[in-house]
């Protein structure tokens, strides 16, 4: 596999629980709210699983836990298990990588985050992802 990590240098978009980035000087309590959602990871995990499974109906996905060993089109249950392992207290400082070869897009799920990051998505892919996240109460935005 080519070096997909070069995609981390490309433009990226965020799939998030919030419709836009919270300003650093916000009067709200972003970090407390984020911790609230992180304590309820199973619900957030289910949303990410449903989005990625639906996306997998349209595109092949290669999934990796270490960035070296990749598996093409995990069974739905295996994809759910992999995402759950990371979002529900998986390896500290670890990420789960989903590569969409046809789109040359890398999706990263960080174990301690309430979002997924899409690196180098095409406009067509962004349009599809925006449609898929709506039923889950998620949003897509560019930092």
Feature annotation, model-predicted:
Residues 1-115, 119-143:
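Structured alpha/beta or helical-core interaction and ligand-binding surfaces enriched in interleaved
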């Amino acid at each position: 596999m080519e070096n997909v990590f070069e995609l981390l240098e490309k433009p990226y978009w965020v799939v998030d629980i919030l419709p836009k980035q919270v300003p650093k000087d916000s009067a709200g309590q972003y970090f407390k709210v984020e911790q609230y959602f992180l304590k309820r990871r199973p619900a957030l995990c289910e949303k990410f699983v449903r989005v990625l499974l639906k996306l997998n109906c349209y595109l092949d996905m290669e999934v990796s836990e270490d960035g070296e060993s990749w598996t093409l089109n995990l069974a739905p249950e295996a994809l759910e298990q992999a995402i759950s392992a990371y979002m529900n207290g998986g390896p500290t400082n670890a990420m789960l990588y989903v590569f969409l070869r046809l789109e040359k897009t890398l999706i990263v799920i960080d174990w301690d985050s309430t979002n997924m990051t899409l690196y180098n998505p095409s406009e067509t892919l962004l349009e599809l992802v925006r449609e898929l996240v709506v039923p889950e109460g998620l949003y897509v935005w560019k930092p």
